[in-house]
Amino acid sequence: KTCMTKKEGWGRCLIDTTCAHSCRKYGYMGGKCQGITRRCYCLLNC
């Protein structure tokens, strides 16, 4: 199963690929921009 966690302190998320790259750098599976405020959410196994 895959879960998502919101990354605090990263500011607005404009491009999914940038978010995914940042998440992978911190050990997550990837990530994408979501929500009205466009924040980066990282993917992880849960």
UniProtKB/Swiss-Prot annotation:
InterPro entries: Scorpion_toxin-like_sf (IPR036574). Disulfide bonds join 3-46, 13-33, 19-40, 23-42. Transmembrane segments: none annotated. Gene3D superfamilies: Knottin, scorpion toxin-like. It comes from the Eukaryota. It holds the Pfam family Gamma-thionin. Present in seeds, cotyledons and leaves. Not found in roots or stems. Keywords: Antibiotic, Antimicrobial, Disulfide bond, Fungicide, Plant defense. Has antibacterial activity against the Gram-positive bacterium S.aureus and the Gram-negative bacteria E.coli and P.syringae. Does not have antibacterial activity against the phytopathogenic bacteria R.solanacearum, Rhataybacter sp and Erwinia sp. Does not inhibit trypsin, chymotrypsin or alpha-amylases. Monomer. Belongs to the DEFL family. Protease inhibitor I18 (RTI/MTI-2) subfamily. This is Defensin-like protein 2. It comes from Vigna unguiculata.
